[in-house]
């Protein structure tokens, strides 16, 4: 890992770290204010595919988080960027609430498959349609491959198992655009003037948040909220830079030890 420099940026996961659905993690709003009172740049990175960036921003504002749209980098944005780069017409397996982030993208007569978290679309007929497109040579673009995520009623399947099923059935490999891909983290830093060695990532997913960030050259702080399960910190190598109870505790550590 590269030599550490003074901390200049903090990347923060959203779902499971700052909030769980429509409930904020206790103390998270005040902790964010304390972090913003420092000289570090704060950006928010999320794999959520359940809603558009605008809907997500409105949810966060209702929870009284001081966040602006240009501070959020989503895997939906990364997926749209790749679709435009490849100039393909995607079959969009995403939640209907996420469709505004693909406004203007041509989807008739699809020649690619883009898959995120879309429970209402994950049934045999739709998946079989995607399967046939892939057999005909269409590329498979996974917005992310999370195994599961946290809802108020407990853990729930993420898109990863469905992406893997399509990979297995078609003997193909998906291009993943969200966390834990190194390019996702580097893209999130674009325009900040900050390097990975000057950055800390805070999240509740040991692999996608912490492991991905550390593979990109950042430090990773794992919080025990959201989807965290006991001993998650032992599932990645190198281990998280720090494992702590929640986002406010992570901010406490940053203020006391990294600035």
UniProtKB/Swiss-Prot annotation:
Cofactor: Mg(2+)
Cellular component per GO, a single term: cytoplasm
Database matches in CDD domains: HAD_PPase
Keyword Coiled coil tagged: yes
Keywords annotated in UniProt: Coiled coil, Magnesium, Metal-binding
Cofactor note (record): Binds 1 Mg(2+) ion per subunit.
Coiled coil as UniProt keyword: yes
UniProt modified residues of type N6-succinyllysine: 50
A Pfam match: Hydrolase_6
Binding-site list for substrate: 13-15, 46-47, 179
GO terms assigned for molecular function: enzyme binding; metal ion binding; phosphatase activity
Regions annotated as coiled coil: 47-71
Binding-site residues, Mg(2+): 13, 15, 204
Cross-referenced PANTHER family: 4-NITROPHENYLPHOSPHATASE-RELATED, HALOACID DEHALOGENASE-LIKE HYDROLASE DOMAIN-CONTAINING PROTEIN 2
Similarity field: Belongs to the HAD-like hydrolase superfamily.
Protein name (record): Haloacid dehalogenase-like hydrolase domain-containing protein 2
Lineage: Eukaryota, Metazoa, Chordata, Craniata, Vertebrata
């Amino acid at each position: 890992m590269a030599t550490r420099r003074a901390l200049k940026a903090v990347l923060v996961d959203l779902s499971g770290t700052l909030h769980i659905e429509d409930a904020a993690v206790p103390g998270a709003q005040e902790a964010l204010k304390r972090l913003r009172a420092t000289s570090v740049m704060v950006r928010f990175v999320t794999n959520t595919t359940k809603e558009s960036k605008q809907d997500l921003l409105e949810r966060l504002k209702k929870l009284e988080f001081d966040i602006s749209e240009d501070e959020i980098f989503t895997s939906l944005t990364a997926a749209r960027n790749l679709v435009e780069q490849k100039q393909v017409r995607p079959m969009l397996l995403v939640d209907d609430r996420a469709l505004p982030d693909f406004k203007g993208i041509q989807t008739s007569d699809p020649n690619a498959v883009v898959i995120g978290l879309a429970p209402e679309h994950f049934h045999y007929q739709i998946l079989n349609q995607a399967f046939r497109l892939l057999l005909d040579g269409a590329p498979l673009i996974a917005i992310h491959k999370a195994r599961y995520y946290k809802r108020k009623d407990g853990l729930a399947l993420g898109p990863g198992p469905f992406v893997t099923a399509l990979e297995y059935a078609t003997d193909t490999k998906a291009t993943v655009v969200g966390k834990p891909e190194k390019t996702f983290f580097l893209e999130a830093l674009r325009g900040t003037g900050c390097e990975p060695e000057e950055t800390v990532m805070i999240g509740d997913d040991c692999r996608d948040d912490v492991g991905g960030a550390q593979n990109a050259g950042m430090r990773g702080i794992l919080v025990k909220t959201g989807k965290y399960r006991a001993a998650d910190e032992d599932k990645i190598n190198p281990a998280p830079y720090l494992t702590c109870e929640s986002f406010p505790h992570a901010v406490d550590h940053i203020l006391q030890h990294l600035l």
